[in-house]
Design a protein with these regions (language model features):
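N-terminal interaction/assembly modules
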Residues: 1-147
Length: 147
């Protein structure tokens, strides 16, 4: 498999989901442990080491960014969720929404790309119903910040 930014986002969601279930004391050590466990970075996948390093950095930026600003991200999400408690959502949905808001807030990735990537991640790791939730929440946030 050739790794892409989509793959890096998948890695980030896997790490964020694991971190939500068992919060790490040392984020870098946590990420290093993850890299030691996955097979996507094996030499036989054919991708150049430099490209893999950039994708690892892309994923790590998101994981460290989200974990470093959980309270801020949750404070943004709670009012948008209306009458839903953040912890009533599934772990995957929380991770996808947090990373989606973080990307919208902290990167120059176009809003439509951020939202579509988050929708696809929710669909891949959770269920088709999650797509609707993620789309609605991130779209509301994107519209609110662009005013």
């Amino acid at each position: 498999m050739t790794a892409t930014r989509r793959t890096a986002r998948e890695w980030a969601i896997q790490m964020l989901t694991a971190a939500d279930l068992n919060p790490p004391d040392d984020v870098q050590a946590f990420m290093n442990g993850y890299w030691n466990q996955i097979s996507d970075l094996d030499e036989e996948d054919g991708g150049p080491a430099e490209a893999k390093g950039k994708l690892k950095a892309f994923a790590e930026e998101r994981v460290a960014g989200v974990l470093g600003s959980l309270k801020e991200l949750d404070d943004i999400l709670v009012p948008i969720l209306d009458h839903w408690d953040l912890y009533r959502l599934g772990t995957v949905e929380r991770a996808v929404l947090r990373m989606g808001v973080w990307e919208l807030k902290n990167t120059d990735v176009p809003k439509a790309v951020c939202i579509n990537e988050a929708i696809d991640l929710a669909n891949w790791f959770s269920s088709p119903k999650s797509r609707t939730l993620v789309n609605g929440v991130l779209d509301r946030y994107a519209k609110a910040v662009s005013r």
